């Protein structure tokens, strides 16, 4: 798996190419990009110790689903290294770069079209709350291999540009 992260970091990142194969959500020969998977403790054998998916998209989607948001990409033209992921989504003409840090990471997205979005896929139980014009706080409960049924993964997304759509506090279960 092409994990990007820092030694002893709190999170790791990888491209997700399928959501149909359980813990085996990346294959090097797949040409489908579903988004950047953020995971606290990755393991294809036992599953993630909590995860979520961030998918850059442009334009409108016929349905708000991962299937309708995914794009093709060329793995041979992408960069997968321990310190960076860089790839181009062909459907949306989006080039993005993800660089990890100890507690988070920086996702730089170069959109070429208008009406741009970042789709969050939050499997399991979740809560979302917009903190201000630049920040969204999320709690996800979708652990694997944990005795605590309420083991939670907390994170805050900070955006350089102000959010154009206000998020009402929401919670649910996927």
Regions found by a protein language model. Give the residues of each.
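Accessory carbohydrate-recognition regions in carbohydrate-active enzymes
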Residues: 1-174
